[in-house]
């Protein structure tokens, strides 16, 4: 496995302008450029040779392993025109024209979603050139009229005076407009690298019309870089940097490449603008897809970044990927939706973007149209559906990883001006490493659970209804699904024992135990003497002894991790939590409701003892007051309590956030109060995310535990619902190896 890690690390350390497959379509345009010295020869004869040497058996050019009619015909016509321009390769041209005549009617049957970028602009222009060259194809085919109509609609959205004077996406397809535009104006929109919006075809056309030296330099560099051919777009540096980081994270292997990922994101951050970014540095045109991916990754890694960039893509009540676009791309809206998930309080633009993107994606799901115009991937519908059904605040990392390992493919194909592949974004090495890592962690987690089972069997907890073996498995799953790294084995065991114990205690006092028993348990925790338990029930004695043994064991381990005694801190954690349970019990028995503020301030989630105990075991040394002075625990408790109350069981119906909210706002209906509490829960999750990502005294690894805990409570909000929802998740993460 470590050989795979080093291979990936080598890839990451070699990132530059992007690894991308070549394009026959763009290479054909470069091959058409006449020699700038005035001789009747091509400026790039090596590109002409590449065309003649790379025709496929059926007479077309393009991706050998994937046939899309639009793509193949567009490339075939471009190559035929290039060869005919220089009166060479007659047999190759004849074979290409046969392919075009035979295949053109199939364009009417192919989904227009898979039409190459700018096809409706460049293809009609090539048809006119083919006619002028007297190439033998059907110029009366009905499908051509449809394409001409699409061209007219697009040009109406972006008028020619705009194209010639302002950066737009049509700079990427100027070869389709070369007879009508003013090249003296357009060349002023040239990118610093000499290209026209990083399009080799568009730049080749500009070179033909202007002889611009920077255009020539750009194409010379590309032809040399790609061995006599060119890609459909270049560079793709920001795109590659971002999508690699995204894939590594979703595959669960990013922890092996912490420094390399930081370098990649530092690079992207360097080119971030207040209007967003595009696929390449220095682009005069930004797009919502790359901007969304960059925003989400940068923010989640702690970079200071403003969501105001999304105003670039807001048009009234809608959001677009590009100004003047013909239609929305599923992946663009998918990434916009994902970006909205890292929203901080008060960020209205992200709230609006997320709402719009979700509505769009839900509509596509209902219509069974979750496929995209920019990528052909293994399971895009599954990716989108998982994101919609599992928002970030209610998603467990290892479950998402397990799902994405099944969805990731090494051979995804992207749709640009022609089909292309990104070998550093999609490759078999990533997948092989992800599977090996997942199976390694799963095997370790199974051994740890066996250790927990032995502890359970040796305890007396099984006599209580709330301490079932299935609940033990489920609490361990919550740890394995969030703090999964092999080196954090003690943290997982401590988390599991603590949450298992707090859930069982909570259930006992909800259904069976008396207020006096709870008070007795708290008194025993205060005395902390297992040999002097006072006059309390047998069950309280058992609960205290089990709690005592757990805390004592954790205290011994904690000394090794912290270099000091943490026993007092661990005891205080349980005393605080049990006292909150007592306060809640007294409120339920009383006729006087607390205010919502009082209620939330006094609420301590059942998962709190697990989180606050585990922070000492994640590899960070904590000063005595670090945790006490942090507001993050209260934020987690508030968010968790609000979520639990919106899914409340009947036993809690007498006292929860909704009943209190109704008491304070009697004019509201129960459903209206529920909506208000749900909105409050979402706002508190945003506050918790903000607190987690901000620098502070508490280390990041510790803060992440509190965020993970709140997410767990969002996934499994009610203790009586845990088993039903968890069973399949436990099986996938703990029991099933990845094949």
From Swiss-Prot:
<keyword id="KW-0479">Metal-binding</keyword>
<protein>
    <recommendedName>
        <fullName>Copalyl diphosphate synthase 1</fullName>
        <ecNumber>5.5.1.12</ecNumber>
    </recommendedName>
</protein>
<dbReference type="Pfam" id="PF03936">
    <property type="entry name" value="Terpene_synth_C"/>
</dbReference>
<keyword id="KW-0460">Magnesium</keyword>
<dbReference type="InterPro" id="IPR005630">
    <property type="entry name" value="Terpene_synthase_metal-bd"/>
</dbReference>
<feature type="binding site">
    <location>
        <position position="289"/>
    </location>
    <ligand>
        <name>Mg(2+)</name>
    </ligand>
</feature>
<dbReference type="GO" id="GO:0016102">
    <property type="term" value="P:diterpenoid biosynthetic process"/>
</dbReference>
<dbReference type="InterPro" id="IPR001906">
    <property type="entry name" value="Terpene_synth_N"/>
</dbReference>
<dbReference type="InterPro" id="IPR050148">
    <property type="entry name" value="Terpene_synthase-like"/>
</dbReference>
<dbReference type="InterPro" id="IPR008930">
    <property type="entry name" value="Terpenoid_cyclase/PrenylTrfase"/>
</dbReference>
<dbReference type="InterPro" id="IPR044814">
    <property type="entry name" value="Terpene_cyclase_plant_C1"/>
</dbReference>
<dbReference type="GO" id="GO:0010333">
    <property type="term" value="F:terpene synthase activity"/>
</dbReference>
<comment type="function">
    <text>Monofunctional diterpene synthase converting geranylgeranyl diphosphate to copalyl diphosphate.</text>
</comment>
<comment type="pathway">
    <text>Secondary metabolite biosynthesis; terpenoid biosynthesis.</text>
</comment>
<feature type="binding site">
    <location>
        <position position="373"/>
    </location>
    <ligand>
        <name>substrate</name>
    </ligand>
</feature>
<feature type="binding site">
    <location>
        <position position="154"/>
    </location>
    <ligand>
        <name>substrate</name>
    </ligand>
</feature>
<keyword id="KW-0413">Isomerase</keyword>
<dbReference type="GO" id="GO:0050559">
    <property type="term" value="F:copalyl diphosphate synthase activity"/>
</dbReference>
<dbReference type="GO" id="GO:0000287">
    <property type="term" value="F:magnesium ion binding"/>
</dbReference>
<dbReference type="InterPro" id="IPR008949">
    <property type="entry name" value="Isoprenoid_synthase_dom_sf"/>
</dbReference>
<comment type="similarity">
    <text>Belongs to the terpene synthase family.</text>
</comment>
<feature type="short sequence motif" description="DXDD motif">
    <location>
        <begin position="287"/>
        <end position="290"/>
    </location>
</feature>
<dbReference type="InterPro" id="IPR036965">
    <property type="entry name" value="Terpene_synth_N_sf"/>
</dbReference>
<dbReference type="Pfam" id="PF01397">
    <property type="entry name" value="Terpene_synth"/>
</dbReference>
<feature type="binding site">
    <location>
        <position position="287"/>
    </location>
    <ligand>
        <name>Mg(2+)</name>
    </ligand>
</feature>
């Amino acid at each position: 496995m470590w050989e795979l890690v080093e291979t990936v690390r080598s890839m990451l350390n070699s990132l530059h302008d992007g690894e991308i497959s070549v394009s026959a379509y763009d290479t054909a345009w470069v091959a058409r450029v006449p020699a700038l010295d005035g001789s009747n020869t091509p400026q790039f004869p090596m590109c002409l040779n590449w065309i003649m040497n790379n025709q496929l058996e059926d007479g077309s050019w393009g991706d050998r392993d994937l046939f899309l009619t639009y793509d193949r015909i567009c490339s075939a016509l471009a190559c035929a025109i290039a060869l005919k321009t220089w009166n060479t390769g007659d047999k190759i041209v004849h074979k290409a024209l046969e392919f075009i005549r035979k295949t053109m009617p199939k364009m009417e049957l192919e989904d227009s979603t898979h039409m190459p970028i700018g096809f409706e602009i460049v293809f009609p222009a090539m048809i006119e050139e083919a006619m002028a060259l007297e190439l033998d194809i059907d110029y009366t085919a009905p499908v051509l009229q449809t394409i001409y109509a699409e061209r007219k609609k697009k040009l109406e959205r972006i008028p020619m005076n705009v194209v010639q004077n302002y950066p737009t996406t049509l700079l990427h397809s100027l070869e389709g407009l070369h007879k009508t535009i003013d090249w003296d104006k357009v060349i002023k929109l040239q990118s610093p690298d000499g290209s026209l919006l990083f399009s080799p075809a568009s730049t080749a056309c500009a070179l033909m019309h202007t002889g611009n030296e920077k255009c020539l330099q750009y194409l010379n560099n590309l032809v040399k870089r790609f061995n006599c051919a060119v890609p459909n777009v270049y560079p793709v540096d920001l795109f590659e940097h971002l999508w690699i980081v995204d894939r590594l994270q979703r595959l669960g292997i990013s922890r092996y490449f912490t420094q390399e990922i930081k370098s990649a994101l530092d690079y992207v951050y360097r080119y971030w603008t207040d209007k967003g970014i595009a696929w390449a540095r220095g682009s005069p045109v930004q797009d919502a897809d790359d901007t969304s991916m960059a925003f989400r990754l940068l923010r989640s890694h702690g970079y200071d970044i403003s969501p105001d960039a999304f105003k670039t893509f807001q048009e009234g009540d809608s959001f677009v990927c590009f100004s003047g676009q013909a239609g929305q791309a599923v992946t663009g809206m998918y990434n916009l939706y994902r970006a909205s998930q890292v929203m901080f309080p008060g960020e209205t633009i992200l709230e609006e973007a997320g709402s719009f993107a979700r509505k769009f994606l839900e509509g596509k799901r209902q219509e069974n149209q979750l496929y995209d115009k920019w990528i052909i991937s293994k399971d895009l519908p599954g990716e989108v559906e998982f994101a919609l059904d599992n928002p970030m605040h209610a998603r467990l990392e290892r479950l998402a990883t397990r799902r994405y390992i099944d969805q990731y493919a090494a051979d995804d194909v992207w749709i640009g001006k022609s089909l292309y592949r990104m070998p550093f974004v999609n490759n078999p090495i990533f997948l092989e490493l992800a599977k090996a890592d997942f199976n390694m962690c799963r095997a370790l987690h199974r051994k740890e659970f066996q250790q927990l089972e032995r502890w359970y069997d040796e305890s007396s907890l099984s006599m209580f209804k709330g301490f079932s073996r299935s609940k033990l498995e489920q609490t361990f799953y919550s740890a394995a699904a969030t703090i999964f790294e092999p080196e954090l084995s003690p943290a997982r065991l401590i988390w599991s024992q603590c949450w298992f114990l707090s859930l069982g205690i909570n259930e006992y006092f909800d259904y069976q135990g008396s207020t006096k028993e709870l008070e007795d348990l708290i008194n025993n925790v205060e005395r902390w003497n297992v040999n002097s338990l006072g006059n309390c029930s047998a069950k309280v004695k058992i609960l205290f002894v089990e709690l005592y043994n757990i805390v004592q064991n954790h205290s011994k381990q904690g000394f090794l991790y912290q270099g000091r005694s943490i026993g007092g801190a661990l005891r205080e954690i349980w005393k605080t939590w049990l006292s909150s349970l007592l306060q809640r019990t007294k409120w339920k028995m009383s006729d006087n409701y607390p205010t919502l503020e009082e209620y939330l301030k006094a609420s301590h989630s059942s998962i709190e003892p697990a989180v606050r105990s585990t922070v000492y075991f994640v590899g960070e040394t904590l000063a005595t007051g670090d945790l006490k002075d942090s507001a993050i625990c209260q934020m987690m408790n508030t968010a968790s309590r609000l979520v639990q109350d919106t899914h409340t069981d009947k036993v809690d119906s007498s006292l929860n956030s909704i009943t209190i909210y109704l008491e304070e706002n009697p004019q509201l209906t129960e459903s209206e109060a529920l909506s208000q509490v749900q909105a409050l829960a979402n706002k508190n999750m945003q506050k918790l995310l903000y607190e987690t990502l901000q620098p502070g005294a508490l280390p990041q690894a510790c803060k992440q535990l509190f965020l993970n805990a709140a997410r767990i409570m969002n996934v499994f909000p009610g203790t009586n619902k845990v088993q039903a929802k968890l069973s399949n998740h436990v099986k996938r993460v703990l029991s099933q190896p990845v094949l």
